[in-house]
Amino acid sequence: MRDMMNMMKKAKEMQEKMQKIQEEMANLQVTGTAGGGLVSITLNGKNTITAIKIDPSLLKPEEIEILEDLIMAAYNEAKTKIEIAMQEKTKSMTAGLPLPPDFKLPFS
């Protein structure tokens, strides 16, 4: 009985921590850059693009393909940064919990 109460308490604590982390992640802003800073994309914790900056030198018809590649590279870098931040947050939250190694949390 004592073990069950302890598990329920830990589950409630974990739920509260998860909610806090989700709120923190929603407010997180990361920027990915490409082309030595010619293109930058900022994402929030929900992987929503909040800003795109493009150096005017890339706004030429003959530079379209390069620009497209740089936008994708900047987005992918920003997305990777968000994923790393989420992993770090969830790792600290789940420390000490008996979870299977491949257990996926709902927001990771």
Swiss-Prot record:
One of its GO terms (cellular component) is cytosol. It comes from the Bacteria. The keyword Iron does not apply. NCBIfam families: DNA_YbaB_EbfC (TIGR00103). PANTHER family: NUCLEOID-ASSOCIATED PROTEIN YBAB (PTHR33449:SF1). Belongs to the YbaB/EbfC family. This is Nucleoid-associated protein BH02310. It comes from Bartonella henselae (strain ATCC 49882 / DSM 28221 / CCUG 30454 / Houston 1) (Rochalimaea henselae).
